[in-house]
């Protein structure tokens, strides 16, 4: 995936819904930060090639859902505002979300609902855009759903979290009537739910899409690499609450295996679709 966009799939049926992964490009993250306290010798031969500064390329996979006459967008990537990013994060080919959507004939004004798992710059940067020199909502008709606690944290960050929460991604929402804050589990429309998944942030969430006995989970920053799906103890240094992350991963991944859920992983190589299996007692990520 180094510096190159992988061809994305067509619409995928899920019961009476349709899913499509759309990409905002590629983000480069310091590989040591991605894998946290896990020693380099354990992961360096298993990951994608690093650049000369030891950065790891990761996807920016967003999800379109068509259901019940609605168009739902889960996550918006870094966006195209040339947004500053935290030190150690270099952006390559970011800001491609709208072009990727346009190739499918979907315009910003066609989006009814936007869902953010959390408000770090690489998950909500495309919520806003410069229009006629002023910050505005990218999706002018959409209602924007996210956890109330995440909104409060993003607007009152501490010294550790401040670098990831950027005011330019938040201010137009605060001034609009389109912000929908939820607490805990929340159904956005029938079959589409926001589920708490704390750890990466205290109010991080995932998104469940269920229809006709089939289920997909968009897992946000539950993991930052597919190796973390296979190895529970591998936790990113970006996680605010690593021990909480561990318990959340156990709960969600055990459920995903038991119920054969389709997983959509934002930072896996595009399109980030796959399932987690138990093979001879070990977790195995099977990318689609």
Please report, for each region that a protein language model flagged, where it lies by residue:
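Active-site metal-binding loops of divalent metal-dependent hydrolases
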Residues: 24-26, 76-79, 119, 149-150, ...
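Residue-level marker for buried hydrophobic side chains located in beta-strands
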Residues: 72-74, 115, 144, 216-218, ...
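Metallo-beta-lactamase
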Residues: 92-106, 110-122, 129, 138-196, ...
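Cap/insert and terminal regions of metallo-dependent hydrolase folds
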Residues: 88-99, 212-288
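Metal-dependent catalytic neighborhoods of phosphoester/phosphodiester hydrolases
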Residues: 87-90, 124-134, 275-276
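Short, P/G- and charge-enriched loop/turn segments at secondary-structure junctions
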Residues: 48-53, 132-133, 194
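Conserved beta-strand hairpin/beta-sheet module of binuclear metal-dependent hydrolase folds
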Residues: 9-104, 206-221, 225
